[in-house]
Amino acid sequence: MHTNRCFSRPSWITVAGTLLLGCATATAEPPQEIEGLKQTLERTGVFFRADAPYVLRDATDPFLPICVEIINGVEKTGRSAISKIAPYITREPLKLEGINVFAKPPGARRQFASQPLLLAGGGELTFDARAEGQPLSLAIRWRKTLEIPRAQLADYLRQHYLGGPFDVVDLMVSIRVVGWPAQNTFLRARDNAPPLPELPGWYRGDMHYHSAYTDNPAERGHPLSVTKQAAVETGLRWVVLADHSTELNPASYAQALKEIRQLNDGGLVFIRGEEITAVSAKEGMLTTVHLVALPCPDDPERGFPPAAGSAETVIMGGDGSVGNPAVPLQAALSRIAAAGGFAYAAHPFDPISPILRGGTWDLASDFLAPDGMGLQPGLVGLEPWNRATTVTADNARDPYCIQRDSDPAACFQPDKDANHYTRLERGIELGWRPLLEKGLAENAPSPPFKVLLAVGSDAHGDFNYEATMDAVDFLSKPSRGLSGYAEDNAFGKLATVVYCPSGMGARGENILRALQNGQSVLSNGPLLVAGFDLDKDGNLGSEGDIMPGGRAAWDAGAIPPLQLQWASSKEFGPLASIRLIVGTRRGEAGAQEIPVPAGKEIESQGLVPIDLHSYMEALTAGWGYIRLEARTRNAAGEEFRCYTNPVWVRVTVP
């Protein structure tokens, strides 16, 4: 969860700010200012959103989906602190005339044509909401997915612009409401993109996604039907629905499962999970943390009942704010474990809003069991790679600077504090390495306890980019707390890639087993896997082979070669670096570079053996582990990465 994500302004935060401003200045302002304040209050909380996948990889889908959503007021559901003020906010219905979609090639010098893209039936609007000339009355909420034929989009661009064909398209989605200025959102999509790099038996997915079942004034996802379409377009094969414990209930959980059964097929698998807001066991005021709960691999539809046969399938609680307490972390983990499920600590070292008493995970109090000899029951790892952010923008409606008059300074700019690699490395340094070391130290000479790594987009819809309210660092840049800002994170940019040699399972059973056992790697493009081909059949993953998440023991003179396999593409660039890291009870030795064989920079073309003897000098007593990192760089200079989960090994000296 990236707290207080929102896609339109003004928001609930603006309500408070505007009321304070009004109380302070009303007596001194001229009539026109009072009228302006009145109009602001009348429109506060009205929500407009347009979204579309940032990339289209599915050649079998002839459409570009554009999601449009309008909410006339504040949601009155959920158990967040914000929802408590919702019953006091009412407004007149909105009058929707329709929606226009305009398209152009990228570049600020090219402007949108005056004529919108018209679908079958003609008229003056891409979508006409009127009936017999009368606008559509929207009392509370309205959603629509416009399916734009990609062939028609290409024809439209050829008609209006020279220099095609265009694989990257800028879009303006214009919502027309009576009495309102046009509500324009600017998007960018890449069409006809190639498939993602693949390796046999490995499936990309998002372990942390919020659907429309996350629905409050600060954070909203998209319906499952269009989420499936967007997931396939971006190259994902499975998605865990990690909607918030502050909003889920047994009825919504059951409804989600009903939808999942209708949508799951061989192309995409949904798994019903939950992001739980919990209270850390450490002392202090800022103690709210999050975890992603995943169901039992043997019964993915069971949920997290406190006892067999119970109808309480979800773990419900507050958001952690004053007067709205969250569930204790240990109680949540105990219930997850009792139901046969497991959990990852979600963004454990990223800040959560102080409004929600947000804190970070504590190694001793939260990760470790009371005796320190393992992780807390139910916990298998952490998710420090969260949100694929490299740049941010103050302009949340046009972060790409698509309009000619956009301020470049307000468009996407590098942001070192938000950079996902910076946050990932911090999470590895603060959490993963110390916990891995602890596992080796506490369990010697027994096999160490495992600590696994995962990644998730934490997208709330966010098919194109993420528009959010900054409720964490709002004092340093107040405009982002009031007006919002954008990040380039998007659904499909990050993936946990799991090994499922027998397929994903109709309900995701094999995906869950791989996540529980660490048979997974983390990637935002290239793939690198490593293991030991013990049956010497030239493949990794046969019965008896050692894969990521596995354990093995050998005499020092009998260590088999470590087999590597990788795949990248022109989009992500050739492998620039393969780094092998060996960990012991004394910590991790410095990363050692493994040369990439000439001619195999894009694809390993089978297994590549690595003699480990020169790398394993540190492993002369007790258990240790091996993990790898790969980095690529494309022609545009963009860097992409892949991280493997460890293989735990014990080397004995005769």
Predicted feature descriptions by range:
Residues 250, 318-487, 570-590, 618, ...:
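Domain-core and long-helix interface of multi-subunit machines
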Residues 197-366, 376-377, 383-392, 425-430, ...:
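A metal-dependent hydrolase metal-coordination microenvironment
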Residues 14-22:
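Bacterial N-terminal signal peptides
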Residues 2-14:
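Bacterial N-terminal signal peptides that target proteins for export
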